[in-house]
């Protein structure tokens, strides 16, 4: 039972958390203004004095930071002692307060080492960069410990870490990713201080110049890391809210999405304005807020008694799996036949970008990493849609429906594939290619599967954009950038997708109607569907000719595209005239051949 004393302690704990956030932000102000050496190489005294007399501005800034940090230390110590007195043995708030005190001690020691070893002001050593990252990581841990203490003191329940399956893994990876992002941000901010630039273009040029200082070269990576981590954090947030449904987890997931969007915008403004001090502070404040929000999401999802969709009313595991799963069952989770065309466009995107052979290493990275990322998305889709898959003839034998693979194991398999796929693409190609593959995965799972598929007939048009990411991945893997031609490949698949999938929807519309999925034929009927297919086929044909106007492709592609488009339009017209299964099947099968041959024609044309 919550007592008045506990309520007062909870209020104090929240206040201590807020104070430590402010102290950490002021520490960033000390670094950004170059005031870290304001007290010389003395610690805990300031220039050999307990209280400096007639201090310079830098000295006053540094001394103020030390004084406020000292108050923060005392506030955490008081929180620990109060928690010991107020809560019984075994209460999680006591553990949280003890953890906070530990990280406060290490925070002080790391801060002292920066001063005593001279890793302040204009020092550009690798040691300073490493300690700066450790300092940031320790601050994150301190704030997390204080947040947990406040949560538990406010009545939050203890955590259950065992048996959480993919949810636990997703949250752990999210915390790890945010920690890595914060550390990269700390190094980037240090580079902005020590190696200022006159413009964004100059920053990019210097970042790509061989022989530049490592702090300069690391600057270009932080934005890509930020986008990658942001995509994952938003994805993990909504997935956790789906698997651990509650009003709080849903609000936290939505808050993460909005807050991270604001953070990316702040990052762009920070770069455009050449990292002014006030913008650096705001950027860091948003980073702390995102970190704490994710900590609270993890806490609410892992709390004992939290609702788990993989558990029945009595707490028994459902979709546990019948056992005996083979490698074929796990391969089936990835939907190899569906992936084949995605992988084809990714690999030929690389061939088109390279105007020939891109190299074995890049080709294998795109093939293996691309398959893993797409396979991960498909495995998650099977878990989410297992309820409707069981009632559709086409999908009734999927391993998540027959329960040869449990939902828990399928999700763990999916996350393992996603992590490995991202790593393969980053290591074998570059971070941009890995980020684009992650964007495709998240678009398919969040936008299409979790949001659009069961809500609107526009699901294919908007959600189908996920299938347009593979050629971007292949292109970026070769060039490290996205040109206008790369976006043309994206647009081509985007407009081709409704032609392909609405033809499929016509073939199995009875299944979709039975399970309540609002595909276009179910909502508006066959006539509206075939009209839409014809319109998108015409748009696809027109877009396929655009590279010729830009001078990117020649006569070989012109001949191939004219023939392929003529057949696409003829089959679409045949479906319009006779909207029956036979003509729908014909268009569906040809649309796959159309896209494959069109990409092959581009690759050959650019190579000769």
UniProtKB/Swiss-Prot annotation:
Its membrane topology: Multi-pass membrane protein
Transmembrane segments: 10-30, 67-87, 99-119, 139-159, 167-187, 220-240, 252-272, 277-297, 338-357, 362-384, 411-431, 432-452, 460-480, 488-508, 530-550, 555-575, 584-604
Keywords from the named record: Cell inner membrane, Cell membrane, Heme biosynthesis, Membrane, Transferase, Transmembrane, Transmembrane helix
Domain of life: Bacteria
GO cellular component entries: plasma membrane
One GO BP: heme O biosynthetic process
Coiled coil stretches, renumbered: none
GO MF term list: oxidoreductase activity, acting on NAD(P)H, heme protein as acceptor; protoheme IX farnesyltransferase activity
Ranges for region COX15/CtaA: 1-338
Pfam families, A to Z: COX15-CtaA (PF02628), UbiA (PF01040)
Catalytic activity of the protein: heme b + (2E,6E)-farnesyl diphosphate + H2O = Fe(II)-heme o + diphosphate
EC number: 2.5.1.141
Record InterPro entries: COX15/CtaA_fam, Protohaem_IX_farnesylTrfase, UbiA_prenyltransferase, UbiA_sf
Region (Protoheme IX prenyltransferase): 339-608
Keyword Secreted: no
Gene3D superfamilies with a match to the protein in the record: UbiA prenyltransferase
Pathway membership, UniProt: Porphyrin-containing compound metabolism; heme O biosynthesis; heme O from protoheme: step 1/1
Record's subcellular location: Cell inner membrane
Family of the protein in this entry: In the N-terminal section; belongs to the COX15/CtaA family.
Biological role: Converts heme B (protoheme IX) to heme O by substitution of the vinyl group on carbon 2 of heme B porphyrin ring with a hydroxyethyl farnesyl side group.
Miscellaneous remark of the record: Carbon 2 of the heme B porphyrin ring is defined according to the Fischer nomenclature.
The name this protein goes by in its record: Protoheme IX farnesyltransferase
Organism: Thermus thermophilus (strain ATCC 27634 / DSM 579 / HB8)
